[in-house]
Amino acid sequence: DFRASEGYGRDWRTAIYRQMGTPELQDYKDGIDYLVANHQADRSRVGIYGGSYGGFMSLMAMFKAPGVFQAGAALRPVTDWRHYNHEYTSNILDTPELGPQVYIDSSPIEHAEHLQGRLLIAHGMIDD
């Protein structure tokens, strides 16, 4: 599990404070390195898939690590934290007024121009 996953203690859970998408992406890249080094994974055939927060991470991976993931699927992802649940987001990123750059750095929409590879985005009206 990447940083911020439940069940590993407070430090692990809060490692993404004011930097959603960055520590987790490093964990994904470390996982790829491990699989290539120890389990004959083919680095040229790595993809990423996820829903909800996993969909957000799929977008961050495709946009902020171009070339690392050849394909991705993001189901019901958050694309801009400024437009998500304030109660949830403000506990992790503060508020857009207090940390506008934090919101920019943590929102996939701000990094979309770096996309390489193939990406499927599927979203309905709500994330349940």
Question: Where does each model-flagged region fall?
Answer:
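Active-site-proximal cap/loop segments of hydrolase catalytic domains
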Residues: 2-128
